[in-house]
Amino acid sequence: MDALRLANTALAVDIFKKLCEKSATDNFVCSPLCISSSLSLIRKGSQGNTASELEKALHFEKVKDPDFGFQLLSSDISKISSANSLKLLKRVYVDNSIECKKDFINSAKKPYPLELETIDFKSQAEEARTQINSSVKELTDGNFETVLNEGSCDENTKIIMLGAASFKGKWVYTFNKSETKEMDFHINKKETKPVQMMHLEARLSIGYINELKTMVLEMPFQSKHFSMLILLPKDIEDDSTGLKKLEQDMTFEKYTHWTNPSMMANSKVKVSLPKFKMENSYDLKDMLKSLGINDAFNEEASDFSEMTESKGISISQAIQKACIEVDEDGTESADVSMERRLMNKEEFLADHPFIYILRHNKTRTIIMLGRYCGPSEAS
């Protein structure tokens, strides 16, 4: 399980860095776990160089049994998801004309429950698209209206890899709504935009990355199954968001070190954090190709002989939608009234761009990650 956690973390950092490269100043949220789970299922059906490319991108070099690892992880997370308002949908849709081997179907059921689905793209592409959209809408409680746009499926569609992730958790400690006030958020050294800033004083885990002058705060959600980790540079020191150095320096090893509980201390913290809601859609094909997954997208080169006898099969589309909402809701008030309010307190003022990670604490798995650079026009 630990080897799989490390592999999933390494892919999550790769994905994060690709999203940062794409744009220096955009807000984003993404679920690397949806991607790694679906890719692992697709890897299970592949052979030869197709399998090698997938295993390399997934960092599976030291993972002895990824299927069993995903089985335990899915089971752990699904048990606590509904109580924590987490919706994770991972699907690999395969066209009916591709006859999947019985062994493949049966062996995928436990590690990737409900993730493999057959559907009729060949003769009813538009109906298939509508059916997929309805299914995603229903399974995410209406969070996502349209995942596949009109014309995105046709009679040549073979495999669609699709992920949808949404989260709106309740913190352990409630932010007092009456203390939420409009404040300036520094988008860069020169510009500000108004945000609704929430305030809280509580005992929380906090760490510091000295070489990057960056604070790491852990904010637990109810029942402490999930936490949000927030990486906040002390100040904006570059000509952009202030995150450039942190984004460039982040590696899988460094992230693991920075967020290790032994690197953090329990302290009284005065937190100021913007309220926000963020949603993104991704066509993942180019990103996955840039991570070295090429054959799986190329029907001339792909080898899915563990899945089917059919030839000329490739992934037609890889799509993800993700959304996250952060507000004051919590389950208990932080009782700091007994301690004098301003004694020896760390201040965590998130009034400039930061990186955030939604983590499953038992396995330290990254469920979602993102970057907040300021209020979007819509919010």
Swiss-Prot record:
Cellular compartment(s): Secreted, Extracellular space
Positions annotated as glycosylated: 133, 176, 361
Main location: secreted
Record-linked PROSITE patterns: SERPIN
Protein name, UniProt field: Serpin B5
GO molecular function: serine-type endopeptidase inhibitor activity
A GO cellular-component term linked to this record: extracellular space
Keyword Secreted: yes
Function: May not exhibit serine protease inhibitory activity.
Any coiled-coil regions, as ranges: none
Classification via CDD domains: serpinB5_maspin
Record's keyword annotation contains Hydrolase: no
Keywords assigned by UniProt, alphabetized: Glycoprotein, Secreted
